[in-house]
Each structure stands twice: as C-alpha cells, then as structure tokens.
C-alpha cells in the first residue's frame, strides 16, 4: 500500500511516496552522479550494515545493474549530494568501483529527508529492534505525534510502537547488546521490570555468560524482584492523602511523557518534611 507524505506526515503537497522503493521513475529525471560526490544520510536510522548482504547486493547489481535509482539531495557544498534513500545500493556500487550511479535529485528539507530515511527503513523491516525504536522516537519528535497517531500512519499497532520505545529506557549497555545480537529483543524486554539500571546490566552479563534463554531470564527477574521485596525497608513518615494524590499524578504524567517517546531522567528523593522530584529533559 502506498501513502503520500502529505497524507502520512503533513509534509506539503509533494507527490513523493513514503514507500521509496517504489518511486515512479517515469515522472522523475534520472541523472548519473559521481559516487565519490555522495555522502551518507545523517538521519539514517540503520547503524549496522551487513557486509555479506552488501556483497550479495553488489553481485546482483553487477549482473543486472541498478533497477531502482538512489535518491539524493544537494548539500550546501558545491557538487556534493546527501543520500535520502538507497544507502545499501550506494555502498554496493562502491565495492564495484563504479564512478557514477543513477540517481534522482530531490529538493527535500531536513524533516522530509529524515522522514524518508526512517520510513523507508521501517518498511523494509530490516532494522534491529533498537534502530526501529530510535526511528519511531525520531518520527514522534519530527512530527509532534502521539504514539496512537504514529501507529495509524504506519499501519502498526500502538502496542508495537510502545513496546519498541520501552527498549530505549534500558541502559546503553543493554541496547548495545541488542544491536550486536548478543541478546534478543525478548531478552531485553524481560529486563524492564527490574527498573534499576545496575540490576539490568548485572543480569545482562549473566544472560550472555550463561547463554540463558528468555524463560530462564524471566525466572531470574522474578527471583531478583522477590529478593528485593524481602529486604527490610526503612520506616517512612506517613503521607497525607493530598500528598499521595500529588505524587501519583506526577508519576502518571511522567509515564505518559516517556510513553510518547521522550526519554526523561527523573529522580525521586524523600526528605524529612517533603518529597522532591527532579526531572531532566534532554534538549
């Protein structure tokens, strides 16, 4: 199914399709551009490219040529172009030592360029779960959307978007492990109930060292949570009803903000006479 950008993300009246892989090249002027004059898309959500798949693509291109031109835009530097879509094809022709590559030149803004790169990769379904989560978060930010609205535009369930975004709350070390395929997405999601980053990282190391499967990881999480419950809790001064309502309202509001894709750094401290919430929002 094809969706115009204007309908999907309100990017104006351009006839560009969100599904870049199916450009109608009959309406576009294809030009031969020097391979060395092209730079990667700075908004590319994919951080890892399989060398083996690039070689396979290069072999196909060597035999059949490039059926689908890459898409680029001009940069401020004279004679230089930035990729919008087709980075795997661009990488493949570099291994073939091609001097020029067929391309379509678009006059896209940063927002349009980022959106095309994100949507193209999401539709190909080759991103890692972390790359996919970052892509969703970026689209939410670029277009000021709710998770529900983004899910509707991408034809996905809201729970799918929410589950991916929750992965971004995990420590960087856990996210790196997903990218490197040291653990699966299900392993990572099993760590989320632990809440504390140090415990999540500790269990991550155990999962990798002992090659725990998802069920074993979930069982370890349950045991760690039970151990935490058994620890003696310091006596606290009782809260008034108004204080409890205020605290719950703040926590719910923070949760809603984080579920929208904004990564907050929050601290909750209890003092003798008051509760202090510290919220840091990255710029």
UniProtKB/Swiss-Prot annotation:
Ranges annotated as DNA-binding: 148-167
GO biological process: chromosome segregation; division septum assembly; positive regulation of sporulation resulting in formation of a cellular spore
Cellular component, GO annotation: chromosome; cytoplasm; nucleoid
Gene3D superfamilies: 1.10.10.2830, 3.90.1530.30
Location relative to the cell: Cytoplasm, Nucleoid
InterPro entries for this protein: Chromosome_partition/occlusion, HTH_ParB/Spo0J, Nucleoid_occlusion_protein, ParB/RepB/Spo0J, ParB/Sulfiredoxin_dom, ParB/Sulfiredoxin_sf
GO molecular function: DNA binding
Keywords per UniProt: Cell cycle, Cell division, Cytoplasm, DNA-binding, Septation
Similarity-based family: Belongs to the ParB family.
Function: Effects nucleoid occlusion by binding relatively nonspecifically to DNA and preventing the assembly of the division machinery in the vicinity of the nucleoid, especially under conditions that disturb the cell cycle. It helps to coordinate cell division and chromosome segregation by preventing the formation of the Z ring through the nucleoid, which would cause chromosome breakage.
NCBIfam families according to UniProt: nucleoid_noc, parB_part
Protein name: Nucleoid occlusion protein
Annotated organism of origin: Bacillus licheniformis (strain ATCC 14580 / DSM 13 / JCM 2505 / CCUG 7422 / NBRC 12200 / NCIMB 9375 / NCTC 10341 / NRRL NRS-1264 / Gibson 46)
Gene that this polypeptide is encoded by: noc
């Amino acid at each position: 199914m094809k969706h115009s950008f204007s309908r999907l993300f309100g990017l104006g009246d351009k006839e560009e399709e969100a599904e870049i892989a199916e450009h109608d090249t009959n309406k576009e002027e294809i030009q031969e551009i020097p391979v060395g004059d092209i730079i990667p898309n700075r908004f590319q959500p994919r951080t890892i490219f399989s060398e083996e798949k690039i070689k396979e693509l290069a072999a196909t291109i060597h035999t059949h040529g490039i059926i689908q031109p890459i898409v680029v835009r001009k940069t401020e530097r004279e004679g230089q172009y930035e990729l919008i879509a087709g980075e795997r094809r661009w990488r493949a022709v570099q291994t073939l030592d091609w001097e020029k590559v067929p391309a379509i030149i678009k006059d896209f803004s940063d927002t349009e360029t980022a959106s095309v790169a994100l949507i193209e990769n999401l539709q190909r379904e080759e991103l890692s779960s972390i790359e996919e989560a970052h892509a969703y978060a970026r689209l939410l930010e670029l277009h000021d959307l709710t998770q529900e609205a983004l899910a509707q535009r991408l034809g996905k369930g809201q729970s799918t978007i929410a589950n991916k975004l929750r992965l971004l709350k995990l420590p960087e070390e856990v996210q790196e492990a997903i990218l490197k395929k040291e653990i699966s997405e299900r392993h990572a999601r099993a760590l989320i109930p632990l809440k504390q980053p140090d415990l999540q990282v500790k269990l991550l190391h155990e999962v990798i060292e002992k090659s725990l499967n998802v069920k074993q990881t979930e069982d370890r999480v349950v045991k760690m949570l039970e151990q935490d419950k058994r620890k003696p809790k310091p006596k606290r001064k009782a809260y008034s009803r108004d204080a409890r309502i205020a605290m719950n309202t703040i926590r719910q509001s923070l949760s809603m903000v984080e579920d929208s894709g904004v990564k907050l750094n929050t601290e909750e401290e209890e003092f003798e006479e008051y509760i202090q919430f510290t919220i840091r929002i990255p710029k």
